[in-house]
Curated annotation (Swiss-Prot):
The protein's name in its UniProt record: Large ribosomal subunit protein uL30
Annotated Gene Ontology cellular component terms: cytosolic large ribosomal subunit
HAMAP family: Ribosomal_uL30_B (MF_01371_B)
Phylogenetic placement of the source organism: Bacteria, Pseudomonadati, Pseudomonadota, Betaproteobacteria, Burkholderiales
Pfam families reported in the protein's UniProt record: Ribosomal_L30
Amino acid sequence: MTTSNTKVKLQLVRSLIGTRESHRATVRGLGLGRINSVSELEDTPAVRGMINKVSYLVKVIG
């Protein structure tokens, strides 16, 4: 299995007020805290699943 060091850059674009607690925990797990905060993570299936779960809150920058 080859290791690719591809990264995904995320930005939190919507507020967490009024969202489910599990979605808030997922956003925290992605390393995002405040609106417009940016986090760069490894591109893994687990991270992709987390992004899909909170896709209405985050934007993939690159």
